[in-house]
Amino acid sequence: METVIATTGLAMMVGLSGIGSAIGLSMAGSSVLGMIKKKPEAFGSALVLSGLPATQGLYGFVAFILYSGDVKTGITMFHAAVVFGAGLAVGLVCFISAIQQANVCSSGIQAIGGGHDAFGKTMILAAFPEFYAILSLVAAILMKGLL
């Protein structure tokens, strides 16, 4: 049972963060496609902004790598609970922050398409939801110290 709980935690780390990144990337990418109709020369800036939600999936994968070696048969319930908790924290925070970051990036991309100089401002604002994804990864790293 403990192995199942821990493996579920691993699955949440990589699964939820990856799903959030995929949703975020498609949201921001759709905004780029709308923007290039109006201002095709701004594709490079919009491309950078549309790729930002991908990082949450990477954080989930890093957490997965950190914990995957600890999950084996015969682990304790406490050990399994730590892995599950870390998976829940990283998975959910990265899932939500990727989508919310995509909202910020999409708005910035639309502003760039409207002729506004919004690239730098959008990068700054997009860093706010990113911070919480990083914080969840740091928390998972610190939780690993409990094992």
What are these regions (language model features)?
Residues 1-147:
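Hydrophobic, small-residue-rich transmembrane alpha-helices and their short perimembrane loops
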